[in-house]
């Protein structure tokens, strides 16, 4: 057992306890933080001022057992950082018990992003107490209540509200502070309780959350077609704030459902170490400085690359890393634009004529489109950014763009081989530019104004065009894509041995190499899948052979595959003459010019 200090006027827990036992709600401290007359000899003293006096009196009277200073967690003002006390005061409340079921039911009709938002909102509504809607501030929207000077009872009737509302329509809510009570009420108005004729205005203002929670009515009621709002988006703290107040006002005051169809929440922007940004810490970042140093689109890319459902880190180091992703996309676009010069976007190669490698690229693009659309639908912008970056790096730069350089640079200008690659490049660039435009608005518009367009496009601005849907007519089936997966795994093994040969000074560039592939076990099936492909083009070497024997060339660099156990790759210097135009080593080169048969034919046709 023990004695517990209980002060119902200075703490919520004590208030509830004393209310349960019918104890008086004593509050011997006024609005200025000074003791009232109830405190006797301590009246007029501030609470901090009275503490040592009370201790002294207790000690002198023999009532003080012990006195000691301790360090403990204590509430402080968020603005001035001084310690505060809690004090019970008369307030206006809105009871939510009568419509909690309706409010939680309204949550079911909302799409919450992230999905756990629904359960969070429901639990907060179910657990909340009455809503205190009054504030003791000198600014804000006044609570339109009057007090009868005769009986002291509050007065708020349809007649008084209508009178105040008409004045607000012409003078605004400041009229409450500028006019006397008699000027705000209808002529001859009397107290409905006692018939009194003299009144005093309420001095409290309305809770700002009640104010903001009513904005959906003010903003959209005039145009019924816009209610409810398509989306509310704010920080995680607004489940207790704007989201909840808007929902409660819509359900409790208007008798409607939720005032929004979707509710999206985000975390906070913090520094590189995860700390909140404060002036006192000096860890904030000025957007203007980011614009000047990196450009506006990089700030947009930072926002579009961050998982905003949690706190988002922001630092100069992060912007430096993102600038590499930005440059990768920009360089990819520049490569495409450079190779689309003179291309007629209204004369695409037909699906049945397109080369299989180009179809592979468009099939991979189709997968990107499907995933990006799904991510956009869920407002997962960071997923879109990462998908596009991976596509530019893995599928394009590391594989496709490297291979088609030869066709783009060395095949005939109007040849099927070159136009097939250009068609794929155009569809890729067109898709990426439209897809990335919501995030990289300025860069994508710059690209859009520089690229060729189809007749159905609006050439003025990229955002005036719908995003591309998958190009099903150009897609490869699963079996065909499996063949290309096998080719990529073999290519990875070959590249590893090519690097080893370069390190051993056996070759310079890959085009100086002749590659021989030998397989055993499961790897034989892999080679069988790709045996009909133009391996020297796809591996970017001058020659590629598939050998049945197990004997590797003595003068070759030979190594086992890492991706395909049982695959052996041998690399040696290619025989023949190096073509001065395409750099491929050919045994059939022209003895006078050194041109390979392909380049000789292209130049002859051009002349």
Regions found by a protein language model. Give the residues of each.
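Short cysteine-rich clusters marking metal-coordination/redox-active sites
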Residues: 77, 148, 191-194, 579, ...
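Residue patterns forming the tRNA-binding/recognition surfaces of aminoacyl-tRNA synthetases
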Residues: 2-161, 174-181, 242, 275, ...
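Alpha-helical recognition segments enriched in aromatics with Gly/Pro capping
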Residues: 21-33, 137-139, 161-311
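Acidic, turn-prone loop/beta-hairpin segments
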Residues: 199, 343-373, 401-497, 501-521, ...
């Amino acid at each position: 057992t023990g004695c517990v200090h209980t002060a119902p006027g200075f703490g919520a827990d004590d208030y509830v306890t004393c209310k349960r036992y019918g104890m008086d709600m004593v509050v011997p401290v006024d609005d200025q933080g000074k003791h009232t007359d109830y405190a006797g000899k301590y009246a007029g003293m501030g609470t901090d001022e009275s503490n040592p006096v009370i201790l002294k009196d207790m000690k002198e009277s023999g009532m003080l057992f012990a006195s000691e200073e301790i360090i403990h967690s204590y509430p402080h003002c968020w603005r001035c950082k001084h310690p505060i006390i809690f004090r019970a005061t008369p307030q206006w409340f809105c009871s939510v018990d009568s419509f909690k079921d309706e409010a939680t039911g309204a949550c079911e009709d909302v799409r919450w992003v992230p999905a756990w938002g629904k359960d969070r909102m429901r639990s907060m509504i179910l657990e909340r107490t009455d809503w205190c809607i009054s504030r003791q501030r000198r600014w804000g929207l006044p609570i339109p209540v009057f007090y009868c000077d005769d009986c002291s009872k509050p007065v708020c009737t349809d007649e008084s509200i209508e009178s105040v509302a008409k004045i607000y329509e012409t003078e605004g809510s400041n009229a409450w502070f500028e006019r006397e009570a008699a000027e705000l009420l209808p002529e001859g108005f009397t107290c409905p309780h006692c018939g009194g004729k003299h009144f005093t205005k309420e001095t409290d203002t309305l809770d700002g959350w009640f104010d903001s929670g009513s904005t959906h009515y003010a903003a959209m009621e005039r145009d019924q077609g816009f209610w409810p709002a398509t989306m509310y988006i704010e920080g995680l703290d607004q489940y207790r704030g704007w989201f909840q107040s808007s929902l409660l006002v819509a359900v409790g005051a208007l008798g409607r459902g939720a005032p929004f169809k979707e509710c999206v929440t985000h975390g906070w922007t913090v520094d590189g170490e995860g700390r909140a940004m404060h002036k006192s810490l000096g860890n904030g970042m000025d957007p203007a400085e980011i614009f000047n140093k990196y450009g506006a689109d990089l700030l947009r890319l930072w926002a579009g690359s961050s998982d905003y459902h949690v706190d988002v880190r922001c630092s100069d180091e992060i912007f430096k890393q993102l600038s590499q992703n930005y440059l990768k996309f920009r360089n990819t676009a520049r490569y495409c634009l450079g190779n689309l010069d003179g291309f007629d976007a209204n004369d695409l190669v037909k699906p049945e004529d397109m080369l299989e490698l180009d179809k592979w690229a468009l099939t991979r693009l189709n997968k990107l489109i499907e995933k990006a659309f799904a991510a956009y639908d869920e407002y997962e912008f960071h997923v879109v950014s990462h998908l596009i970056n991976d596509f530019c790096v893995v599928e394009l730069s590391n594989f496709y763009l490297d291979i088609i350089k030869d066709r783009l640079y060395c095949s005939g200008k109007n040849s099927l081989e070159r136009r097939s690659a250009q068609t794929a490049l155009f569809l890729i660039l067109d898709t990426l530019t439209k897809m990335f435009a919501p995030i990289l608005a300025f860069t994508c518009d710059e690209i859009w104004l520089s690229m060729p367009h189809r007749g159905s496009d609006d050439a003025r601005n990229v955002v005036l065009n719908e995003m591309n849907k998958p190009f099903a007519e150009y897609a490869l089936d699963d079996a065909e894509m499996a063949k290309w997966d096998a080719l990529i795994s073999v290519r990875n093994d070959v590249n590893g041995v090519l690097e080893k040969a370069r390190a051993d000074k056996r070759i310079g560039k890959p085009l100086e190499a002749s590659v021989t592939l030998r397989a055993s076990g499961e790897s034989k099936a892999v080679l069988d899948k790709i045996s009909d492909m133009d391996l020297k083009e796809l591996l970017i070497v001058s020659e590629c052979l598939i050998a049945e024997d197990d004997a590797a060339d003595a003068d070759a660099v030979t190594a086992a595959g890492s991706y395909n156990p049982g695959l052996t790759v041998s690399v040696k210097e290619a025989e023949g003459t190096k073509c001065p135009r395409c750099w491929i080593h050919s045994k059939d080169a022209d003895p006078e010019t050194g041109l390979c048969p392909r380049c000789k034919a292209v130049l002859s046709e051009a002349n």
